[in-house]
Amino acid sequence: DPQETLPGLRWMLSTGEALSPELARRWLTRYPQVGLMNAYGPAECSDDVSFFRVDTQSTGGTYLPIGQATDNNHLQVLDDDLLPVPLGGIGELYVSGTGVGRGYLADPGRTALA
């Protein structure tokens, strides 16, 4: 069925929720001609801040990478003292750049807590 092959679709962008490796594998098996991109962007940002092009090899683990930062954004994993952790270390992801919101509109209390 030509409609099931999605002949006009060149890319599928997954964003908003984590894309599971299993779902990515199913997509790549069914639509190998359509590129698959895993995007990441927290609510505090105006849009996605990183992209990862998913291939069959990357779907073998328990999660998919979020990829590299988009232009004008920067990603770092920091510890409780806001210092960078070594590769593979445990910390929290910090996003900086032009896409990060400056606070909560007309709500200085929530902005201070953020």
What positions do the PLM features span?
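Short gly/Ser/Thr-rich phosphate-binding loop of adenylate-forming enzymes
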Residues: 1-5, 11-34, 43, 61, ...
